[in-house]
Amino acid sequence: NNLDAAMVDRLILNDERIEAMAEGIEVIVELDDPVGKERVIGTRPNGIEIKKMRIPLGVVCMIYEARPNVTADAGALCFKSGNAVILRGGKEALDTSLAIAELMQDVLEKHNLPKALVTVVPNPDRALMQELMEQRDYIDVIIPRGGEGLINYVTDNAKVPVIQHFKGVCHLYVDKEANLDKAMALLLNGKTQRTGVCNALEGLVVHQAVAGDFLPKVADAFKEKGVKVHVNEKGSQYFDGADVISEDAYGEEYLGLEIAIRVVDDFEAAVDHIAQFGSNHTEVICTEDAEKGKLFQRAVDASVVMVNASSRFSDGSQLGLGAEIGIATTKLHAYGPMGLESLTSEKYLVNGEGQIRD
């Protein structure tokens, strides 16, 4: 069907992935329900007491490509957080999504709950998707999850608020104080463990002070793994036959065995590169300088910023959320992996004893 390797990888549901889906739901079951939780804001001078309470968003519409596991994750997360969910998946995984939703609906009905709480749109026609995106009276938020084209289409055409889950152009910066063995492990895990996912590494930034020691080893490892390298002029001497990359070619989400590399003069240049070409998803520094790590975490604008840990941990299941509905790359109303709490909002609770405003 002319599907690329990244798409095929997302579509596959083998025993291991089915077990992982089930385990994710079991973790969600054990998590605290955020709905109804109150936090005290304070008491005003006039005596009124102010709190805020967690409430569901309402009706969530997921628009996604491939990834049948999204059907299970989104259904479980939305139900646990008190939301109804409409799931509009891609045609490639439609039968699988319908089968998963049917299982969830059977369980809902057995417990005298409306099966419409988890609904899969059975027709992937784009005209129907457009109609869904215009239902401001019935849908509270749309969460698109997929390729850049889908995200842009939904953002440009929806009349319902959208939480964007944009592409994952994730970088590893190898600092001059890096442990190069750690850096190599982070690089190979982030780039080659699973390439067709949004938390895979797409960029490597290396301080010039360690480039001579590190990049020849990278060249050997990538040759063995079959990784195609695009590198700037300063780093090209370490790679035989690598493409010398143009400035405007950085920022690509390859979703395969390809990577863009830049050798930089200093820490500030690394941060500038990430600011220009990252996608606010996940960024990693490898350094033994704790203060440099903290500075990186403060300076870099991304939903997840890591020190000496693989970008592949940028995932709801790995961060203790059980599963995620996606990884938000815009700051409204959530940022990063979205779990139960991200599927709620807050309302004010104000208690008084008859106070009136002067």
Where are these regions (language model features)?
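N-terminal Rossmann-like NAD(P)+-binding subdomain of aldehyde/semialdehyde dehydrogenases
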Residues: N1-I50
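A glycine-rich helix N-cap at a beta->alpha junction
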Residues: D106-V120
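Substrate-binding/gating loop at the entrance of the active-site cleft, primarily
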Residues: I41-V85, G90-I100
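Short, well-ordered beta-strand elements within core beta-sheets of diverse protein domains
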Residues: V205-V206, G256-D265, N280-I285
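A structured beta-alpha segment of the ubiquitous adenosine-cofactor-binding alpha/beta core
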Residues: N14, V27, P45, E49-K52, ...
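C-terminal core of ALDH-fold dehydrogenases
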Residues: D272-R357
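ALDH superfamily catalytic-core signature
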Residues: A66-A84, L103, K110, L150-G256, ...
